[in-house]
Amino acid sequence: MDMRDIQQEIFTIDELKSLLFPVFQGYDIRRAVLFGSYSKGVATPKSDVDLLVDSGLKGLKFVGLVDDIKRSLNGKDVDVIDVSHVNSGSMVEREINDSGVEIYAK
């Protein structure tokens, strides 16, 4: 499979759960929520994977988490945001509350 095929792969929510479980455990993530097109069931081959994590990680440790998530998803584009960066009442918070799917919890 070449890189273009990998980027166009669409994962199911169950696949995302099983692929990301060891990453979330390894980084001691408290909770992870899938949102965006994947949580709504409308992902296309070009969709990235949007994740909200409750990690407490900062700086290079957070970058390492994002890299490991991307690697676990065969290089698929990901957008990872920590709960500490979500502003109350923001569009992101509303989207997560409206259509987010919890895929990991401690």
Predicted regions and their residues:
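Catalytic core of pol beta-like nucleotidyltransferases
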Residues: 1-31, 40-45, 56-106
